[in-house]
């Protein structure tokens, strides 16, 4: 039986990073989202950070109002973000760790250590009909706790694997890859839907697309950088093609 289709979520955070570097309204992350969808994206991801360093509150409202595909709202588990997410009512919320000092999300949520704090946020989002995902490492204890907390989805943090691949650290890349493969299977067997993201490029997206347990990839920084050279629509089409090549081997 062929594997289920693999969805592509395009993260538009770094369109907003470019805009905010100069101020004003351009480039517009909502326009980027619309172009990405037209070119074949299955959904849009945006991370509203507490310091508003890229995506702003009004961007989230406009994305929800203007795009025709599912909106995945990445956020820290705080009361302020909960209020905004319940007002925005995106298709999905992905709970992520967040530190003001970090340049990008540096690791996965510690679901094991923070399960008591996370549980009420997961329950409220579930009750509101918003699909909840937890951004975690491919660690058995974290995956098992995610299932116990009744989060229907996990997103596996692929950053360590992608960095090792790019840096040519073959042994580390192989070890991280084995963790991802095992983690995706464990999560699927536990009844979780499995997504993946962070640091993916054409090559690593094609590789991970061959894992039938993974249903969605969320990719942003690489695609926005590549779009500077070939355009966003072409980048989305090329990423979609890379994913499809990988999926054909699942």
Swiss-Prot record:
The active site is at 47 (proton acceptor), 74 (proton acceptor), 198 (proton donor). Its main location: cytoplasm. GO terms for molecular function: pyridoxine 5'-phosphate synthase activity. It catalyses: 3-amino-2-oxopropyl phosphate + 1-deoxy-D-xylulose 5-phosphate = pyridoxine 5'-phosphate + phosphate + 2 H2O + H(+). It comes from the Bacteria. 3-amino-2-oxopropyl phosphate binds at residues 11, 22, 199, 220-221. Pathway: Cofactor biosynthesis; pyridoxine 5'-phosphate biosynthesis; pyridoxine 5'-phosphate from D-erythrose 4-phosphate: step 5/5. Homooctamer; tetramer of dimers. This is Pyridoxine 5'-phosphate synthase. It comes from Bradyrhizobium diazoefficiens (strain JCM 10833 / BCRC 13528 / IAM 13628 / NBRC 14792 / USDA 110).
């Amino acid at each position: 039986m062929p594997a289920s289709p693999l969805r592509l979520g395009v993260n538009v955070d770094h369109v907003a990073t470019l805009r905010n570097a100069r101020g004003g309204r351009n480039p517009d992350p909502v326009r980027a989202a619309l172009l990405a969808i037209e070119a074949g994206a299955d959904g849009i991801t945006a991370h509203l950070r507490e310091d508003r360093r890229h995506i702003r509150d009004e961007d989230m409202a406009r994305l929800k109002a203007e795009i025709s595909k599912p909106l995945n709202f990445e956020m820290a588990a705080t009361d302020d973000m909960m209020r905004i997410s319940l007002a925005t009512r995106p298709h999905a919320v992905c709970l992520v760790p967040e530190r003001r000092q970090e340049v990008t999300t540096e690791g996965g949520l510690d679901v094991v250590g923070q399960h008591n704090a996370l549980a009420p946020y997961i329950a409220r989002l579930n009750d509101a009909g918003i699909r909840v995902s937890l951004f975690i490492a491919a660690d058995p204890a974290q995956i098992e706790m995610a299932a116990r907390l009744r989060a229907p989805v996990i997103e596996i943090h692929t950053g360590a694997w992608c960095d090792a691949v790019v840096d040519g650290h073959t042994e580390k890349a192989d070890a991280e890859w084995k963790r991802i493969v095992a983690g995706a299977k464990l999560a699927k067997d536990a009844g979780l839907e499995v997504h993946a993201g962070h640091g993916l490029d054409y090559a690593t997206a094609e590789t991970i697309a061959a894992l039938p347990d993974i249903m969605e990839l969320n990719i942003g920084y690489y695609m926005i950088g590549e779009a500077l050279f070939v355009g966003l629509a072409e980048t989305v089409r090329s990423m979609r093609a890379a994913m499809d090549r990988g999926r054909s081997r699942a």
